């Protein structure tokens, strides 16, 4: 991506933030995990913080977020760190995190990817709070999406809850994540093709009118994004 393309992308992002209902601040770039305190002060001045991560995401970014908070004088509670083994978006983790956070007068900072983000998203909503997220992998496209996908009673369900008020993605951390996570994110990009077709059909039958701004934001750069060869993935043929 050249300088012009980067500027065009950021212009689109800024316009999207102006229209967004939930997310109001976004920082993406190299080394920006160090700006976690900056965003927290912008969005939650005067509040305490509490980092929520798993064992892996704590190592790759959680400790850096904590250092950023400490160096800025932000008071933070003891971080809540899930075990990495067999950790997924299950209701039992919702209950355990809720039990911990409801006794803390603090704003959660989700440090991780889809599972951590959705878990903190729903629990924060249940407690009537907002939160921010620091991403650790480009494994999906729902960091700033409304709703959380959680397994409850044996079924994956989507629960209504607002997106994070702020989101940070450090590109160096994302690039260093396991390659299968990037492949998962690439699959989410591919899903934009049938999603676009669904929206066209919904518009045609009068169910959901296409919003031209949202359409262009998602679809205009999709072909270029999908044309990037995933050189780090082995290709095998039968």
Where do the PLM segments sit?
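ATP/NTP phosphate-donor binding region
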Residues: 1-107, 177, 184-187
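Solvent-exposed alpha-helices and their adjacent loops that cap or buttress functional pockets
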Residues: 18-20, 43-44, 100-103, 124, ...
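Short beta-strand/turn micro-motifs composed of small residues
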Residues: 53, 112, 169
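Short glycine-/acidic-enriched loop or helix-start segments at secondary-structure transitions
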Residues: 61-63, 119-121, 143, 178-179
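A short, small-residue-rich loop immediately preceding and capping a beta-strand
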Residues: 101-137
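A glycine/threonine-rich phosphate-anchoring loop and its flanking beta-alpha core
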Residues: 125-224
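A conserved active-site cap/scaffold subdomain adjacent to cofactor or substrate pockets
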Residues: 220-238
């Amino acid at each position: 991506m050249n300088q012009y393309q980067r500027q065009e992308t950021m212009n689109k992002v800024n316009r999207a933030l102006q229209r967004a209902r939930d997310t109001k601040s976004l920082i993406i770039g190299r080394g920006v995990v160090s700006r976690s305190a900056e965003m927290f002060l912008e969005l939650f001045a005067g509040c305490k913080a509490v980092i929520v991560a798993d064992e892996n995401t704590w190592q790759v970014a959680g400790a850096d977020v904590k250092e950023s908070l400490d160096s800025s004088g932000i008071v933070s509670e003891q971080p809540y760190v899930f075990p990495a083994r067999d950790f997924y978006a299950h209701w039992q983790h919702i209950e355990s995190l809720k039990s911990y956070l409801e006794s803390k007068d603090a704003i959660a900072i989700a440090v991780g990817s889809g599972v951590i983000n959705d878990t903190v998203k729903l629990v924060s909503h249940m407690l009537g709070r907002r939160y921010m997220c620091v991403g650790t992998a480009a494994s999906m496209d729902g960091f700033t999406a409304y709703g959380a996908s959680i397994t409850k009673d044996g079924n994956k369900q989507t629960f209504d809850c607002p997106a994070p008020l702020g989101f940070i993605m450090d590109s160096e951390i994302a690039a260093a994540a396991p390659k299968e996570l990037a492949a998962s994110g690439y699959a989410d990009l591919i899903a934009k093709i049938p999603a676009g077709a669904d929206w066209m059909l919904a518009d045609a039958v009068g169910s959901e009118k296409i919003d031209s701004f949202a359409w262009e934001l998602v679809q205009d750069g999709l072909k270029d994004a999908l044309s990037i060869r995933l050189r780090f993935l082995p290709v095998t043929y039968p």
